[in-house]
Design a protein with these regions (language model features):
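Short, conserved recognition motifs on repeat-domain binding surfaces
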Residues: 1-405
Length: 405
């Protein structure tokens, strides 16, 4: 299909070198009557210098480089090369778009090269699983029993299965988050479970479960009953603090349907009410999506109409400073219209300086560069909508080679 590139075709483990074409290095030699003579790179550069050069290539180009020859293949697979790669500035985050509701298949978008790659995700079975990512690792949790948990690197396909979290086996709502410590390469996974108190719609049991990869164990530092609010499926970890959205169960006005709760993962206090950390959302929202941009909490939200708060009229982006929201951007109307019919809920995720926004009803993908304040459509995804009720969703992740669960 036009515009599609198979990610597997770039992986030296799966493809023979003669399947990929490369340009040769050449220079003009006056002594040979102006004819070009090939100059093998192997004779010019020592291993350590070649490793540093290759480490600055985009991810896809690194896999292509591994197909050039045996020497280059061994270099890109070496531990020293992975260390060099880890010292290079992070690659721009990619966006994986699911193209089926039944199977975990789709394409990953590279904003640097503006290309889509066919990527096969390990572990995950359907696109409706819970997904969270941090620093090259992605965490999956099944949506049925919520007992299957995996942490993987979607680029290298390395993965690890986590033990089932403690507490309630079944919950009405769950929120998943992961945070990787770049210095130690250890990670924390949090699951917030929310379940209605039997016979009381206004009261909801809420529990926070934390997995520490260093200790390889779960702890449940907090359980609490919320009145008038319930947990949902939005959470993220920024600079050691767990943020999650809560939703009104009735009694509040139309401007008070969402709220934000914070929980410090370092202190892990089990005392005091969570509701004391309540932070109101900046305006009436149809939905909110939380993300970590350089350890700052950013929320992308659908802005509701004043007279019909459940009807979306636009999309805003806010950053949390202390307990105050600061609007950093609002989607221009031409891009909002460019999605066509836009539902009151939508997919959005981001990291570093990029935010991706996607309508569930179409494969169109909009990218916002926070640093440059620039909106831009992605290259067209190599998939078309086959039937009216077909849904599209996805998630953002950092493409990294050196991270392993």
């Amino acid at each position: 299909m036009e515009g599609e590139t198979s990610w597997i075709s770039h992986c030296p483990d799966y493809v023979a070198p003669d399947m990929v074409e490369f340009d040769s290095f050449s220079e003009l030699n006056d002594e040979d009557n102006g004819e070009a003579s090939l100059v093998p790179v192997d004779l010019i550069l020592p291993d350590d210098l070649l490793e540093r050069i290759l480490a600055y290539l985009p991810i896809a180009s690194i896999f292509r480089a591994g197909c050039v020859c045996k020497r280059w293949y061994e270099i890109v697979k070496s531990t020293r090369f992975l260390w060099n790669f880890s010292q290079v500035l992070s690659q721009k985050p990619w966006y994986f778009m699911f193209t089926s509701s039944e199977e975990p298949v789709g394409y990953a978008y590279d904003p640097s090269l503006r290309k889509w790659y066919g990527v096969e995700l390990p572990c995950i079975q359907t696109s409706n699983w819970f997904i969270a990512s941090s620093c090259g690792l992605v965490c999956f949790m099944d949506n049925d029993s919520r007992s299957e948990l995996y942490v993987c690197n979607p680029i290298t396909k390395c993965y690890k299965s986590l033990d089932e979290p403690p507490g309630l086996k079944f919950s009405d709502y769950s929120a998943l988050a992961i945070s990787v410590n770049k210095k130690t390469c250890c990670y924390s996974v949090t699951i917030i479970k929310s379940k209605q108190v039997p016979g009381n719609f206004f009261q909801w049991d809420l529990a926070i479960h934390i997995y520490d990869s260093g200790k390889m164990m779960w702890v449940t530092p907090l359980t609490e009953v919320l009145t008038g609010w319930r947990g949902g499926d939005e959470s993220v970890i920024c600079d050691g603090v767990l943020y999650f959205l809560i939703y009104s169960t009735g009694g509040g006005g139309p401007d008070n349907r969402h709220g934000l709760i914070t929980y410090n993962l370092s202190s892990r206090s089990s005392h005091g009410l969570l509701i004391r950390s309540f932070i109101p959302v900046p305006c009436s929202l149809t939905c909110g999506r939380l993300m970590n941009l350089k350890e700052k909490l950013v929320m992308v939200g659908g802005i509701g109409k004043p007279d019909r708060p459940d009807i979306i009229k636009g999309i805003g982006i806010w950053e949390l400073n202390g307990k105050e929201w600061q609007e950093i951007a609002r989607m221009p109307h031409k891009y909002f219209q460019g999605f066509g019919e836009f539902d009151d809920v939508f997919a959005s995720s981001g990291t570093d300086d990029l935010i991706y926004i996607q309508s569930y009803g179409a494969p169109a993908l909009l990218v916002f560069d926070v640093k440059q304040k620039q909106w831009r459509w992605s290259q067209k995804c190599p998939v078309t909508k086959r039937f009216p009720l077909q849904l599209f969703t996805g998630f953002c992740f950092e493409p990294r080679l050196e991270m392993a669960p």
